[in-house]
Structures are given as C-alpha cells and as structure tokens.
C-alpha cells in the first residue's frame, strides 16, 4: 500500500476538490505537480486554523446572503403585482413577447434592487392578462411574483 501525503488545495482542481480542501494524494503528485505550481501547500496546524476561520467567515456570509434573499422575497410578496406595458395589435396579441428582462426591469423600477434576468423564469406571454413568474433569489430561496401585462 502506497504512502499518501496530506495537502491543502490553494485552488480548485476538478479531480481533487475545492480551494481550501485537505486531500490525500500520492507523494510524487504533490512533490512534482501540486506544490511547485502553487496548486497546494503542505498541511500545518496554522494552515488548518486559517482554513477553519475562512470557512466560518464563508458560512456567516452565506447565511447573510440567504437572509437578504428571504427579506427580498418578503418585499416582493408585499408589493404583490408588477405591471408591464406592451404594444398590442388589433386582435389583442402583443407585438413580441414579455421576456425575463422585462420582468427584471419592472422589479428593479419598483424595488430599486437589481435582479439578474437569468434567475427569472417567465411563461410564454403573447397576450394581455395576469401571469406568474418564478424568481430564484438564492440556492434555497425562490419567489413567485404576479405580472400584469397591459397595453
């Protein structure tokens, strides 16, 4: 059975893990590739403490982001309905469709907070009426907003 050495990754490597992970690798792999190219460093007690502190900070930051997403979801449900104005033909059909970019602009104008349009899922909207769009605010938090399409 071959001897393995522990190293701390300083950048993410697809086959090993993420930045900050402690992994066991073959001594030659560590000595010839990971350490000389700065992709890993040897494990020491001080480095382990640094990793623990860094992970604690990341956890606090992640919880803060989640709480902000929950607060924003509450704000969106408080507002309730967003109105989007579009041009309509004689038969009541829209010129074009309502896109997730249109929804993002409506939310931004009402809340003064930017939302990435790629986080919004909008059904195909080709006519006037009320619709529901889904917004992913965080990995664990999503919201549904009502959209009123008017002329």
Swiss-Prot record:
Claim: rRNA processing is one of the keywords in the record: no
Pfam families linked to this entry: Ribosomal_L9_C, Ribosomal_L9_N
Keyword line: Ribonucleoprotein, Ribosomal protein, RNA-binding, rRNA-binding
Family in the record: Belongs to the bacterial ribosomal protein bL9 family.
Any GO BP: translation
Keyword set includes Cell membrane: no
GO MF annotation list: rRNA binding; structural constituent of ribosome
GO CC term, one of those recorded: ribosome
Protein name: Large ribosomal subunit protein bL9
Organism of provenance: Prochlorococcus marinus (strain MIT 9515)
Chain's role: Binds to the 23S rRNA.
SUPFAM superfamilies: L9 N-domain-like, Ribosomal protein L9 C-domain
Taxon lineage: Bacteria, Bacillati, Cyanobacteriota, Cyanophyceae, Synechococcales
UniProt xrefs under InterPro entries: Ribosomal_bL9, Ribosomal_bL9/RNase_H1_N, Ribosomal_bL9_bac/chp, Ribosomal_bL9_C, Ribosomal_bL9_C_sf, Ribosomal_bL9_N, Ribosomal_bL9_N_sf
Gene: rplI
């Amino acid at each position: 059975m071959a001897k393995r050495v522990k190293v701390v990754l300083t950048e993410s490597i697809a086959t090993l893990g993420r930045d900050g992970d402690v992994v066991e690798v073959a001594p030659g792999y560590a000595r010839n590739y990971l350490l000389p190219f700065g992709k890993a460093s040897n494990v020491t007690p001080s480095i382990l403490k640094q990793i623990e502190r860094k992970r604690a900070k990341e956890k606090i930051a992640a919880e803060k982001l989640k709480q902000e997403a929950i607060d924003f979801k509450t704000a969106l449900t408080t507002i309730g309905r967003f109105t989007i104005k579009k041009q309509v033909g004689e038969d009541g059909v829209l010129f074009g469709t309502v896109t997730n970019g249109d929804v993002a602009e409506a939310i931004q104008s009402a809340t003064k907070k930017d939302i990435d349009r790629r986080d919004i899922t909008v059904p195909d909207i080709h006519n006037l009426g009320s619709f529901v769009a889904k917004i992913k605010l965080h990995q664990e938090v999503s919201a549904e907003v009502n959209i009123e399409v008017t002329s």
